[in-house]
Amino acid sequence: MNLLYRKTKLEWRQHKEEEAKRSSSKEAAPTGPVGPGAVPGPGVRVRDIASLRRSLRMGFMTMPASQEHTPHPCRSTMAPRSLSCHSVGSMDSVGGGPGGGLTEDSSTRRPPAKPRRHPSTKLSMAGPGAETPPSKKAGSQKPAPECRESSRKVPPQKPRRSPNTQLSVSFDESCAPAPSPRGANLPLQRLSRASRITGDLDAGAQEEEPVYIEMVGDVFRGGGRSGGGLAGPPLGSGGPTPPAAADSDSEDSEAIYEEMKYPLPEEAGDGRANGPPPLTAPSPPQQTHILQPHPHPHRRPASALPSRRDGTPTKTTPCEIPPPFPNLLQHRPPLLAFPQAKSASRAPGDGVSRLPVLCHSKEPAGSTPAPQVPARERETPPLPPPPPAANLLLLGPSGRARSHSTPLPPQGSGQTRGERELPNSHSMICPKAAGVPAAHPAPAALLPGPPKDKAVSYTMVYSAVKVTTHSVLPAGPPLGVGEPKTEEISVLHGMLCASSRPPVPGKSSPHSGAMGSAAGVLHHRSCLASPHSLPDPTGGSLTPLWTYPATAAGLKRPPAYDSLKAGGVLNKGCGMGAPSPMVKIQLQEQGTDGGAFASISCAHVIASAGTPEEEEEMGAAFGAGWALQRKVLYGGRKAKEVDTEEDGARAWNGSTEGPGKVEHEDRGPVPSGIPVRSQGAEGLLARIHHDRGGSRTALPVPCQTFPACHRNGDFTGGYRLGRSASTSGVRQAALHTPRPCSQPRDALSQTHPVLPLPLPPQPARERDGKLLEVIERKRCVCKEIKARHRPDRGLCKQESMPILPSWRRVPEPRKSGTPPCRRQHTVLWDTAI
């Protein structure tokens, strides 16, 4: 503050002097050789100084000491000002020679008098009568030179009037608006003072004397007004400047808000500018998303306001949502929620084209999406054929994912990248439903900001489920919809992982019968808002669903949480250790029906996804874990980093969860990738519940959902897609047979009932081969990174924990003892650090 203030003060003085000279010269010219003409410049300067002092007093405690004490106690301190002012005045003195020397003294004495005069200047602004009181005040202030100065001051007062109209008016402007913003506005003032200074200079506050106001909000503005761009150029708040000039008074009162507003519009404009391209064309959205993720991240750190900025613009321009959502969602997931719906509607093609871009731009899912893209693209072709079913599934999944949206939002960043590839069941769906599917990716991207790591997990889950869905597609016939039904199943699987399979409601007519509609549909509906289940058939409903998920407090999301927690149907039950059997039963029941496989997976995914949310919400770790997850995701957005982090987390964070997740993964590897999820929901959720007791609360959710989905997609290679967040799950899913963990296989035996559907995964095994390759690479990288970053992991343990548990699964050793030791070791690291 002191440094900034000093710099500002110096600049202000310099610019003020320059402006004072200019104004004095101008005033002198109109005034002519009249003595007062010479004084006006210094008088104005003195006033500016006084107003600055007051503003400094009001605004900065440090500033008052330097300026107030310096000018008031010591005229010598003011001497430079008065000299500089008089130097300007010297030009005036040329006009009024006799007043020159006196001008210096008067200017020296004037600064105190003029500050007092400023209040009177308010009157003087109203009428010349006010000038007289300033003279009296000045006289009272300085008894001995009073008479001289009074007489001398009187002429300056007249110039003051003209300066009041010019400079003083600007001072009034800065003074009057400043009062409300004083306290809160000072920090912002620095940022906005450039714009306000510029605006004030241009606006020339009509009321000069509100010294208090000036002190409050326009300390820099007032100085800047007189000083021109002194503070303004350094601050470089040019963008807001025009508004500041227009609304200097209201601006000062609303300075804080205004500053926020201006940046908001700027960001809104940027977001809108970026957003509309996605709306316009798929390729622009890709570029926009790729480019915006970086700008928005910068804005985000700049302030929480950016989120507001983008949030408001997002609402205004749905197109803007996709670009800002990846990075800004952390700040405003709810804000993006509604625009999200718009995004869903507006970005049918965009979602497809931009989602992959986002996936790449989002590092966590970026690596995964690349492998995922092939799977997703492969699966995507089938998905488009059944757009109606896709829409239903989309609605269901998005609602589910959104009820689950806290984890899903991370998808936005991670999933957006893989969305097209299949990170998002929605993205997958996007190919299905031109308009609605895109909406899902956008919402996913929007929501991801806050729970980004979950998004990664879910992106992985989506990918895994997606692949599994494709694999399940052969089993899809039980659905009885044929190819479209298979498409729905794919979507459902994507949703199962990401949105707890709300697509089941979408497919509820074909799928609910196979699923044991009570278990599958009920579960999905409880997971997603009933509207989700109902609107499933409607693309329009999808948008509300997105809003529901996007809005953390959105109407739909709360219902989802209610279903997860209160309704709980299967979500909370699954989330809870006891209800997990219900999920398992549902899985088995649904698993009995080949078509119900997705529904079962959905139930478990819901349980896992819902459970993670519940866990997160139930445990303080939810917020902290979420933030950590986001940090981890942001920090290690690269799929390799994510994998490494997750692996490391498994080693040190998922020791307990590691075995459970290993089981889960092994279950997942079972042909019934979704049943794996079911078991994961059951056993893993139970483990998560236990682990939840620990810091894994948030972590199990993404990892669980991820691993389950990966396992669900294991046959399909969905786990491959999910390898990024749940690489361990993916790798183990691929390697589930070789996996040494017998517990997961036990769980697998439990999930085997659903194996019938997983049989289709064979086609996806080709993808699995590629995914396995990637997974192996990631394993190596993760091992290396683990060795290097485990200390970091210890630091980020809480952050990474949510994601890492699934990675903990990645370690083939699955040594419950060793991973716990690692975790403990990491924990020690955290404690030590």
Curated annotation (Swiss-Prot):
Stretches for region Involved in CYFIP1- and NCKAP1-binding: 76-181
Tissue: Expressed predominantly in brain where it is present in the neurons, but not in astrocytes or oligodendrites.
Pfam families (UniProt xref): NYAP_C (PF15452), NYAP_N (PF15439)
Cystine connections: none
Function statement: Activates PI3K and concomitantly recruits the WAVE1 complex to the close vicinity of PI3K and regulates neuronal morphogenesis.
Entry comment on modification after translation: Phosphorylated on tyrosine residues by FYN upon stimulation with CNTN5. Phosphorylation begins at 14 dpc, reaches a peak during perinatal days in brain, then gradually decreases.
Coiled-coil region(s): none
Protein name: Neuronal tyrosine-phosphorylated phosphoinositide-3-kinase adapter 1
Quaternary structure and interacting proteins, as annotated: Interacts with ACOT9, ARHGAP26 and PIK3R2. Interacts with components of the WAVE1 complex, CYFIP1 and NCKAP1; this interaction mediates PI3K-WAVE1 association and actin cytoskeleton remodeling.
Region of interest (Disordered), residue spans: 1-45, 64-191, 219-423, 645-674, 736-765
Residue ranges with Basic and acidic residues bias: 8-25
Keyword line: Phosphoprotein
Positions with biased composition (Pro residues): 275-285
Biased composition, class Polar residues, residue ranges: 162-171
Residue ranges, compositional bias (Acidic residues): 248-257
Knockout mutant characteristics: Triple knockout mice NYAP1/NYAP2/MYO16 are fertile and appear healthy. However, compared to wild-type mice they show a clear reduction in brain size, exhibiting a reduction in the size of the cortex and striatum, but not the olfactory bulb or corpus callosum. The total neurite length of neurons in these mice is also significantly shorter.
Biased composition (Basic residues): 111-120
Extent of Gly residues compositional bias: 220-239
